[in-house]
C-alpha cells in the first residue's frame, strides 16, 4: 500500500526556462504526412511554425489548409510566418542547385523590415516556452533556409536546436 501511494505521488519539478527548451525544425521532403505528424507528436510539439513563403504543396497533405487541419486534429497549433520564407528568386536558385546564390538572396531578404518583424514574433513565441517546430520542404536542414532562421534566432536567444527527421516508411 505504501509503495502504491508513493507511485501515485509525482515529484514536483521546476518548469524549464523557455530558452532552455529546444527549438525543433522539420522538413517534409520525401515523407508522408503521417510520418511528419508522428515525428511532431513524438517530440511533443505544441505549435508548428510554417516558414514557407508559399504554404502550398503539390504533395497531398502539406498545403496550408490540409496541414493546419491535420495538426488541429492532433492537438498541435499552426502558424504561418510567410515573410520568413525564401523569396521566389531564392527558390529558383535552390532548384538549380546554386546554394551560394540561395544564401545570398535569403540573407538579404531576412534583413527586410517584414522578415525582421516576423523574426521578432518568432523570438517572442520561443520565449513563451511552447514546444515549437519550424517547417519547410527541405529534408536536410543544412541546405534549407531554416538554418538561416535558426542562426538569427540563436543570436538573440540561448535556445538549443534539434532537427527532426521524419521516417520515409
Language model feature labels by segment:
Residues 1-169:
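Residues lining hydrophobic/aromatic ligand-binding pockets adjacent to catalytic sites
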Amino acid at each position: 500500500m505504501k509503495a502504491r501511494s508513493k507511485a501515485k505521488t509525482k515529484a514536483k519539478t521546476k518548469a524549464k526556462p523557455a530558452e532552455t527548451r529546444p527549438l525543433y525544425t522539420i522538413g517534409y521532403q520525401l515523407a508522408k504526412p503521417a510520418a511528419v505528424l508522428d515525428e511532431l507528436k513524438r517530440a511533443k510539439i505544441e505549435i508548428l511554425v510554417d516558414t514557407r513563403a508559399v504554404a502550398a504543396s503539390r504533395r497531398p497533405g502539406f498545403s496550408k489548409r490540409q496541414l493546419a487541419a491535420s495538426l488541429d486534429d492532433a492537438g498541435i497549433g499552426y502558424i504561418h510566418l510567410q515573410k520568413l520564407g525564401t523569396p521566389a528568386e531564392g527558390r529558383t536558385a535552390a532548384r538549380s542547385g546554386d546554394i551560394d546564390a540561395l544564401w545570398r538572396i535569403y540573407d538579404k531578404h531576412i534583413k527586410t523590415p517584414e522578415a525582421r518583424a516576423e523574426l521578432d514574433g518568432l523570438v517572442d513565441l520561443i520565449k513563451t516556452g511552447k514546444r515549437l517546430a519550424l517547417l519547410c520542404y527541405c529534408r536536410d536542414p543544412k541546405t534549407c533556409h531554416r538554418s538561416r532562421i535558426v542562426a538569427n534566432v540563436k543570436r538573440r536567444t540561448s535556445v538549443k536546436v534539434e532537427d527532426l527527421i521524419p521516417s520515409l516508411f
